[in-house]
Amino acid sequence: MAVGIDSKWFRRYGTGAAPRRRLVCLPHAGGSAGFFHGWGTAFDYGVEVLATRYPGRQERLAEPGIDRIEDLADEVTAALLPFADVPLTLFGHSMGASVGYEVALRLESRHGIRLQGLFVSSRKAPHKLTPHTTYLDGDEALLEEVRGLGGTDGELLDDPDLREVVLPALRADFTAVGTYGPRTAAPVGCPIVAQVGDADPHITAEDMAAWGEVAPAGFALRVLPGNHFYLVEQRDAVVRALAAHLG
């Protein structure tokens, strides 16, 4: 039972009722649990939201970041086990989609836990990724990549002191993103819902459709208005789709 468990890996948002479902949110590279703070009270009673706290930021600032998707997935999987007393759905945005996919595989193969669903957002399917590390050549190249994607507070990147604080986590995350893939198209046993913004400069609907190749249990593709961070402006639409799925 997860009642009373205090995990450094998750910020828990409850509704005051015993959970019958859990939604686990996995942030983008450079992101934090705070990105999903507005989701905590967006669902009906009985749905608990777990916003994942990656090391190297916010409450875990003193910890080193993890620079491999597989290693990050190992840690998240282990941390999730006490919360698997009710059905789990994962929502991963950008880097978080890759982490979510790897967590789904580990929960199934190592622990016999099949997710209720996997939502993947703004990230190519694992077997369609190609290594991309040119932005790791130096701090300025990395910062340019982060600015181009959006989603990170400009003040953090422009202020020299704040930049020094966030750079280690950014470098770890973008190393993980850039060195992950390609890999075989290992299927997951739960339905997958892929989402993307129609004006995303990096990911197309065709890219996201490839997730269907690892989703024998069911697949749906949703294209919403917006860019790589469409889910900020389309938050209500995203939450409605998740609520319908969670039941």
What do these predicted ranges mean?
Residues 1-91, 95-247:
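Domain-scale detector for complete catalytic domains at protein termini or as standalone homologs
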